[in-house]
Every structure is written in structure tokens, then in C-alpha cells.
Design a protein with these regions (language model features):
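Sensory modules in modular signal-transduction proteins
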Residues: 2-27, 148-174
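Conserved hydrophobic beta-strand signature of PAS-family and PAS-like sensory domains
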Residues: 31-32, 178-179
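N-terminal capping loop/helix in small sensory signaling domains highlighted by a polar->aromatic N-x2-3-F motif
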Residues: 35-39, 182-185
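PAS-family sensory domains
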Residues: 42-43, 50, 189-190, 197
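Terminal output helix/cap of sensory domains in signal transduction proteins
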Residues: 48-94, 196-241
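PAS/PAC sensory module
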Residues: 75, 89-93, 100-106, 122, ...
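Output-coupling edge of small sensory domains
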Residues: 109-111, 256-258
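Sensory coupling linkers of modular signal transduction proteins
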Residues: 114-152, 260-277
Length: 277
């Protein structure tokens, strides 16, 4: 049995700390691990299932589209992340091992480095629920909270992992201040993080001027990172923006709340990639 790479080990350690449903597959698409937060959706504890081989977990969870048709493997986010080496997002129905069918949204991204190549993929998924508007008072409370995110073990693990990956990742604290983005994100941001340092998301929003594909400006409270941080719900969105290098780009972005041990609210994580035209 081959030993998992350090990135797989770090991803599993990080997932164990987070209150966000996460599962990990290897490059053969064998299910290596899912965390405690994923157990209510998958309908079984990982201790009861252990590693699930390729094909078995697809047959067990029976992902289907809105019409009830089984999704072929090539349309499933984890398979696309492995086969195409790029992130993939999809909304679908999934039946857990408890027999309950749920509507879920899922993002999968490859776990890959320049040194080791593709080692597997991580899936972050959530049950679809209606999102309420963020009350202004909640946004003010979040902004006034003292931030201790930078020194949290979850953030330290995430930064160690992100700095090794080819996937662009951005992290902000519970106040909406940028904690870091990894080297893979620098070409999309248009500047190295060492040259920029911490900024507030509101200032960030003004600088990048994100818009929908029809040109409508995206309000800061509607940005995926804001939704994830303030509503503590994952969020996916496609938008256009102008980087700090002056280049206009079209990206897909998914953000999820950085909820740590004891449900500590540490901020939000953004994963983004250039969308197809």
C-alpha cells in the first residue's frame, strides 16, 4: 500500500478540525476519508465505512440530476477534478446511506502540486437551504469582533496546505480582513501577497469591481466570501473582475465558512478558478 502524500495528510488533518462537510479521494477515486461534519449527510460514520473503493461509493450514494437520472461518472465533480485536473461545481440529488435523499451543492478540486503531480481530490459539499438576507446588525457585530483567526490551528494547517497546492485559495478572518492567499492565486489577483498584506473585503471589493456576467455590480454583502462569513453557509458564484494588474478575468468562485473546533467562527475560505468562456 502506497503512503499518502503530505498534502493528503494535511487535507485530512484540516478536515478533521472543520465543521464543514469534506471528503477526500485518491487519484484512483477511492474514498479515503470523510469528516464528522459529512456524516449526517452521508448517513453513516466514517468509522463504520472505512475506505470505500472506486465505484462503490457512487453506487451507494446514487447522485442524480433534477429529473432523477443517475449522473454518469464524467459529470460528477470529484471525477472531473481527477480526470480534468480542475475544480468542478454541481447541484444534484444524493441519497445517503441512511436512505434519505437530499439536494446538495458540491465543489471538488484537485489535490496537486508541481513536485508530486495529482494525488487526489477534495470534495466540499452542503445541503441546499434558503439563504436569508444578512441583517446590518450582524455585519456590524462581525466587524467589531476581535480576530484571533491568524493563530488558530485550523488557519495554520490551511495555510500550510494551500501554499503547497496548485489551486488558488484565499482566506479572510471573521472581520472580513484578508489573512492570506497562496502563490497559486497570485496570477489571478495580479500581485504577490507579500506586496499587498491585509485588506478589508469592502476595500477589496472596491478595488476589483466585481460584476455579474450582465455587467451588474456585485454588492459586497453578496460576494461569496461575505455570504460564507456572515451567513456561515457555503456559496458559489460566477463573476467578472479586474485584477490588480489591470487584466479583466472571468472566474468561478466557491466560498465556505471557516468553522473550527467547538464551532469557532474563524472567517471564510475562497477557492476560485478562471471560468471557461
Amino acid at each position: 500500500m502506497s503512503r499518502p502524500g503530505i498534502e493528503i495528510i494535511l487535507m485530512r488533518q484540516l478536515a478533521s478540525y472543520l465543521a464543514v462537510p469534506i471528503l477526500i479521494v485518491d487519484r484512483e477515486r477511492d474514498l479515503l476519508f470523510f469528516n464528522e461534519s459529512a456524516e449526517p449527510i452521508l448517513g453513516r460514520r466514517f468509522d463504520e465505512t472505512g475506505k470505500i473503493h472506486r465505484g462503490e461509493w457512487t453506487a451507494s450514494f446514487r447522485p442524480t440530476d433534477a429529473n432523477g437520472l443517475l449522473l454518469p461518472p464524467e459529470e460528477q465533480p470529484l471525477t472531473r477534478a481527477i480526470d480534468r485536473g480542475e475544480p468542478s461545481y454541481r447541484r444534484s440529488w444524493m441519497t445517503g446511506l441512511d436512505g434519505v435523499a437530499r439536494v446538495i451543492e458540491g465543489l471538488a478540486f484537485p489535490i496537486a502540486t508541481r513536485e508530486s503531480g495529482l494525488m487526489g481530490a477534495a470534495g466540499i459539499f452542503w445541503e441546499v437551504r434558503e439563504r436569508a438576507a444578512v441583517p446590518p446588525s450582524l455585519a456590524q457585530q462581525a466587524a467589531s469582533r476581535p480576530s484571533r483567526s491568524r493563530h488558530a490551528v485550523e488557519v495554520i494547517l490551511l495555510r500550510r496546505l494551500a501554499n503547497r497546492l496548485l489551486m488558488p485559495i484565499l482566506v479572510e478572518d471573521s472581520e472580513g480582513k484578508l489573512l492570506f492567499y497562496n502563490p497559486a492565486a497570485e496570477p489571478l489577483i495580479g500581485r504577490r501577497f507579500a506586496e499587498l498584506g491585509p485588506v478589508q473585503l469592502r476595500d477589496w471589493n472596491d478595488e476589483f469591481q466585481p460584476t455579474d456576467e450582465d455587467g451588474s455590480r456585485i454588492k459586497v454583502e453578496d460576494h461569496p466570501l461575505s455570504v460564507a462569513r456572515l451567513q456561515q453557509q457555503p456559496c458559489y458564484r460566477r463573476f467578472l473582475y479586474q485584477g490588480l494588474d489591470g487584466v479583466k478575468r472571468r472566474v468561478d468562485a466557491a466560498a465556505f465558512p471557516l468553522l473550527g473546533l467547538c464551532n469557532r467562527h474563524l472567517g471564510a475560505v475562497g477557492i476560485f478558478w478562471e471560468g471557461s468562456r
